[in-house]
């Protein structure tokens, strides 16, 4: 009788030890084409190791530039990594399809609550335009989706490798960045003067400004989220001429 009890206890302990843990049964969230899930995760480690998706059946010689670019592409990413994504920006996007461009193919309009409330006002202005005045920006700019960013400067000032393509649940997602740059009307000049500035008193030029967005980067064989710099605006810099002081 005692042997039977011992046998049942041992079988029960073996069954508990062999049961799958809850961490192994975490459901894999399927991201949408416009963006990926931003669910917070209880785990606090910074990055998950990833494996490179290489095709050994048809090896081909690669140049040094191709090897450097390959470190930021064709990466299989664990979906749990996107559960820790925070501080999302509309200027950083993961998608399987190119983001939509505006009608002039130069800018994208992001509507917030204030813009939605002012749509009727803008429509009235378009229906009743004022012909005796011109509305121009101080500096000309162009906004585009950047699809091939492989290098960037992080928040610590270090150069990091940005992942171009990621393989998530057997589907390839591309990392897009919406950047605004200065558009120089005169290609012969490195910097253009600002519009509407009195050149008799001021020296002026247009320059880009940058901000930080959260991006998926690679460091060795580890993928993690980092803040990187991207161009977000074109502003005017004015300097008073010294001979007028």
Curated annotation (Swiss-Prot):
Propeptide residues according to the Swiss-Prot or TrEMBL record: 19-125
Positions of region (Disordered): 47-69
Primary location class: secreted
Subcellular location: Secreted
Disulphide bridges, residue numbers: 139-206, 182-234, 194-236
UniProt keyword terms in alphabetical order: Cleavage on pair of basic residues, Disulfide bond, Glycoprotein, Growth factor, Lipid-binding, Metalloenzyme inhibitor, Metalloprotease inhibitor, Protease inhibitor, Secreted, Signal, Toxin
Molecular function per GO: growth factor activity; lipid binding; metalloendopeptidase inhibitor activity; nerve growth factor receptor binding; toxin activity
Residues annotated as glycosylated: 148
Signal peptide: 1-18
Tissue specificity: Expressed by the venom gland.
Annotated GO biological process: cell surface receptor protein tyrosine kinase signaling pathway; modulation of chemical synaptic transmission; negative regulation of neuron apoptotic process; nerve development; nerve growth factor signaling pathway; neuron projection morphogenesis
Role description: Nerve growth factor is important for the development and maintenance of the sympathetic and sensory nervous systems. It stimulates division and differentiation of sympathetic and embryonic sensory neurons as well as basal forebrain cholinergic neurons in the brain. Its relevance in the snake venom is not clear. However, it has been shown to inhibit metalloproteinase-dependent proteolysis of platelet glycoprotein Ib alpha, suggesting a metalloproteinase inhibition to prevent metalloprotease autodigestion and/or protection against prey proteases.
Oligomeric and partner information: Homodimer; non-covalently linked.
Family: Belongs to the NGF-beta family.
Protein name, per record: Venom nerve growth factor 2
Species for this entry: Hoplocephalus stephensii (Stephens's banded snake)
């Amino acid at each position: 009788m005692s042997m039977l009890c011992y046998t049942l206890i041992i079988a029960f302990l073996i069954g508990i030890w062999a049961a799958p843990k809850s961490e192994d049964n975490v459901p894999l969230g399927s991201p949408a084409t416009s963006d990926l899930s931003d669910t917070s995760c209880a785990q606090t480690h910074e990055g998950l190791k990833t494996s490179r998706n290489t095709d050994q059946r048809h090896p081909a010689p690669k140049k040094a530039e191709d090897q450097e670019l390959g470190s930021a592409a064709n990466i299989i990413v664990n979906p749990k990594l996107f559960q820790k994504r925070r501080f999302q920006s509309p200027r950083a996007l993961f998608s399987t399809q190119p983001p939509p461009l505006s009608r002039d193919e130069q800018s994208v309009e992001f509507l917030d609550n204030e813009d939605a409330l002012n749509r009727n006002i803008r429509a009235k202005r378009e229906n009743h335009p004022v012909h005796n005045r011109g509305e121009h920006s101080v500096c000309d700019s162009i906004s585009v989706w950047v699809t091939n960013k492989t290098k960037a400067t992080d928040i610590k000032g270090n150069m990091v490798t940005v992942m171009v393509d990621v393989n998530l649940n057997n589907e390839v997602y591309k990392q897009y960045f919406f950047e605004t740059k200065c558009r120089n009307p005169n290609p012969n000049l490195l910097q253009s003067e600002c519009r509407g500035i009195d050149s008799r008193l001021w020296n002026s030029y247009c320059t880009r400004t940058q901000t930080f967005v959260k991006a998926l980067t690679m460091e060795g064989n580890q993928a993690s989220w980092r803040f990187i710099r991207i161009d977000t605006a074109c502003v005017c810099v004015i300097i008073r001429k010294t001979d007028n002081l």
